[in-house]
Amino acid sequence: RSAGAEGETFGEVVFNTSMVGYQEIVSDPSYAGQLVTLTYPQVGNYGINEVDMQSRELALAGLIVHDMCYQPSNWQSVKSLPCFLAERGIVAIEDVDTRALTLRIREGGAMKAAISTTDLDPASLVARVQASAPIADHNYVADVSCKEPCVIPAKGECRHKVVAYDCGEKAGIAKRLAAVGCEVTVVPWDTPAEKALALDPDGVFFSNGPGDPETVPPVVEAVRACLGKLPVFGICLGNQVISLAAGGQVEKLPYGHHGGNEPVMNLLTGKVEITAQNHNYAPVFPTFGPLVPELSDGVTKHPSDLRFWSSRHVAPVVMSERYGRIRLTHVNLNDGTPEGIQFLDLPAFSMQYHPEAKPGPNDSTYAFAAFARLMDGVEDYLAIDVREGRRF
């Protein structure tokens, strides 16, 4: 039955395994064009508050849950989740066997789907879904990015000025940057690099965002224009566009990573971080270039599975034609996808997961301190004990 706004919506159905944090999930711009299935059986128990929003508008195509709570209980709650969705025009459905749906997605991959309160003929809906355009055909970044620049002040003393390319940036990321002393000037996704550099920043940040990184060539060009000129940091889509700029390739994952419990090994420390993730695409590390054997434990040929490196506790290095040596710093222990890279011959690094969490664990918040250290000129800027960022 309907659990949100009346109407119908089309998109690509994915699943998120987080037990809590539904407000942050539905307000994450990275979900633009997607029908989000929440695997946890009961959703909405603590309502909607005024502090956890990750964007002003909701970008997801729709929400799929098993059991929706209509009478939430929490001291911060101002309204129920179904009321919130209805007010924002988001179509939602409940009484769905979300775990069975998740298994279907895992077996068949993310697929086109629809939710409708108006067309109740399954055959008609299926035909219209099949005729709908795939998510990769649309530039969702242009939909969710800011239209004008804005400035977010540093929390406390301003140590650095950062330009942040808004490809769908979550509010939690800007807050993390501000917390490490960064004054953040957020600019639209298609801002020419010369305009960003004219602001005389100490570093440039490329944010998370929705969709296929191949649909945003202006952002890739901006990355190329910034690399080597000043410190660069990227998260999620930011990691993907940095990878493309460096000459690597990006592939679509079968069903993506969406949730707050993805184990990632930090190859520099050998520690495992439990991370929050939300992406459908990932870089293909071997396409960056050939291995540098003397910096890769003597290995000369790329392994078929990057967990080869986590089993050895080795952070391999490749030689990129454009930017020299690039190190693999993080690997996903579930499927072996690359989760982080570091440029060794210029000041830049990026991560595929979300170190700010929102929602999720705080194992990786050190990434923002690392960016500040990079702008300070610290050579071993990533040498931070992950336990420093953990706050329970």
Give residue spans per PLM region:
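Residues that mark the start of a beta-strand
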Residues: 159-163, 183, 231, 274, ...
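Short FAD-binding loop at a beta-strand-to-alpha-helix junction that anchors the flavin cofactor
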Residues: 347-353
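Catalytic beta-strand/loop cores that center a nucleophilic Ser/Cys/Thr
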Residues: 271-346
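Proline-centered loop/turn at the N-terminus of a beta-strand
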Residues: 91, 161, 231-233, 249, ...
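RNA-binding accessory domains that recognize and position tRNA/RNA substrates
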Residues: 1-194, 198-199, 213, 322, ...
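Cysteine-nucleophile active-site neighborhood
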Residues: 203, 207-288, 361, 370
